[in-house]
Each structure stands twice: as C-alpha cells, then as structure tokens.
C-alpha cells in the first residue's frame, strides 16, 4: 500500500468476505449501517449482526450451525457421490437435474441449527440408491431451508435489517 500510495485497512478474513459481498451486490452502503450477513463458506456457516466500526465493520455471530458448515456438508455429499473436491459447483450443477425435489426440515432454534441429521439422511439416501441428482437437490434445498428459517427468526430480533450473503456456498444457483 505504501509503495502504491493507497490506503491500507487491516481486516479479518470475515470482514473481507463481508466487504466483498457488499461490493459484488452493489450495496457498499450496507457497510455504513446495521445489517445481517450470512457467511456461508467451506468452513463457516454463521449468521452475523454487522455494524459499522470506523472504516471497517464489527460482526457478532447471532446464529448458524452448531456443528459442520454448509460447505463441509456439500463436500461430504460430493465425496459420497464420487465427485471431485471441492464439490460445490458439481453438486450445484447436478441438483438441477433432480427428478424428485424433496428436502429435510432442519430444526432451528434461536437462529441456530445442526446439519448432522441432514448428513445422516443424505448418507441414508445414498445407501438406498437415490439418484445423485436427487441427493444433491435434497442437500442444497435442506441447507437453504435451515438458512431461511434462521433468517426469519433473526429478523424477529432485528426487524427491517437487510440481509447479505457472503462466501462461496452462497454462490450456488438455488441459494
């Protein structure tokens, strides 16, 4: 930054995801006011309450998974189905070929939930011979259901706040 005479803002990995998501959504204005952010990546599934903090933002976790992340579940699904790692793009593409569009109701309490039951159900479907496309749809639709329910619960506590999604998992077509 010094060599190029540009500002340097030290930030966390999470703050970087939040800023990148705001920029790519064309909503840099969100960084100047409170909002909610889903950080959905390979290792993180967190619902954050974000407030301005000087030139950066401060994020407080208010929900998300209590065990494995959405990205881990998607990659485990891909591995189970023999797909390449990381499996996000392949699971996303395969889900669009699903003939049966079922989902699992993820139990959400205070905007928090667990994906271990969903992982067990995915493994059971694979053992039963369910088509890979149907399994991919099932997993993604179930993740989305959990995220949507947690978002609704959080908006009861933080009414009217906009919601932004950040991270690689958030880029799938169903999301």
PLM regions with names:
Residues 1-2:
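Short beta-strand-loop/turn "lid" adjacent to the catalytic site in phosphate-handling enzymes
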Residues 6, 10-36:
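Conserved phosphate-binding catalytic cores of ATP/NTP-utilizing and phosphoryl-transfer enzymes
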Residues 15, 51-97, 120, 124-129:
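Glycine-rich phosphate-binding loop plus the immediately following alpha-helix
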Residues 19, 37-39, 45-49:
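Short beta-strand scaffold segments in enzyme catalytic cores
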Residues 24-32, 37-41, 53-54, 97, ...:
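Solvent-exposed alpha-helices and their adjacent loops that cap or buttress functional pockets
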Residues 35-39, 67, 164:
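Short glycine-aspartate micro-motif
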Residues 89-163, 169-175:
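A contiguous, well-structured pocket-lining segment that forms one wall/lid of small-molecule binding clefts
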